[in-house]
């Protein structure tokens, strides 16, 4: 059974005593980590909570009886050549460097670019984690935090929001605003309190996603709902943490979605509830790079789009205003980017 690993794993197998390993697992679960590397003999630790336990059986990483990767201790050139030989031979390769100062991380990342093997680097400090994610701009596929004790995990709290790079949005000029009749709109209630100006990337075309902001603002008629993004019509695309898109109609409680904060950083948020209701809709068209794009939102003053002057209510939006958008080329097939010619109107 092949599994998709997240950008951050926790390692507990390297510690000598059972109590030390148990403390790491407990602390990792309290911090919200979901994938932990264990020793095969630590079966009892699976019952500390609901998480994905990956067993380190020698060099082999096992899940549900299947090898999903290799854990390689890197001490010199010989092990580096072994690492290179595993390209496209295993789904995941975890590198545990003996000395970060002499590890040619750039060589690893360049060798494994566009490979079928994901490369993870074991790190002990947040500085090492950032280096691993930023080397040669693209960075490694993920990191494995290798703590000496539970207290070490606290230092990585900021790294979790750094899993995703800052997204610099472009501006599009609003060219048309028109009311529509009733339609099915999707309201996403998250398990997080979202900031003013924070929102999700949503649009009618996958090549242009608008920043639809959270309902973190007070209104004359309704209290703020800082956990909510009134996302728009059911047909719309929304950007997910793995870089794919989904239709809003597919979103359900328990999903993870991507949220863009006002400083440009991205974070994942959990969906607690989705409401699809019939509401009056609003069609907004904008032009960027010589092309025209659109988004369909509920016609209500609590719905706001991100703009250079802040989050602006769709009730106050005017022709000629600038709104923030995320542009990309190509198309999407089942949510994945495709280098193809496509025309979405």
Swiss-Prot record:
Domain of life: Archaea
Signal peptide start and end residues: none
EC number: 1.4.1.24
Catalytic activity: 2-amino-2,3,7-trideoxy-D-lyxo-hept-6-ulosonate + NAD(+) + H2O = 3-dehydroquinate + NH4(+) + NADH + H(+)
Record carries keyword Transferase: no
Keyword Amino-acid biosynthesis: yes
A GO MF label: 3-dehydroquinate synthase activity
InterPro entries assigned: DHQ_synth
Biological processes per GO annotation: amino acid biosynthetic process; aromatic amino acid family biosynthetic process
Free-text function comment from the UniProt entry: Catalyzes the oxidative deamination and cyclization of 2-amino-3,7-dideoxy-D-threo-hept-6-ulosonic acid (ADH) to yield 3-dehydroquinate (DHQ), which is fed into the canonical shikimic pathway of aromatic amino acid biosynthesis.
Protein family (similarity comment): Belongs to the archaeal-type DHQ synthase family.
Name assigned to this protein: 3-dehydroquinate synthase
Organism in which the protein naturally occurs: Methanocorpusculum labreanum (strain ATCC 43576 / DSM 4855 / Z)
Lineage start: Archaea, Methanobacteriati, Methanobacteriota, Stenosarchaea group, Methanomicrobia
Gene of this entry: aroB'
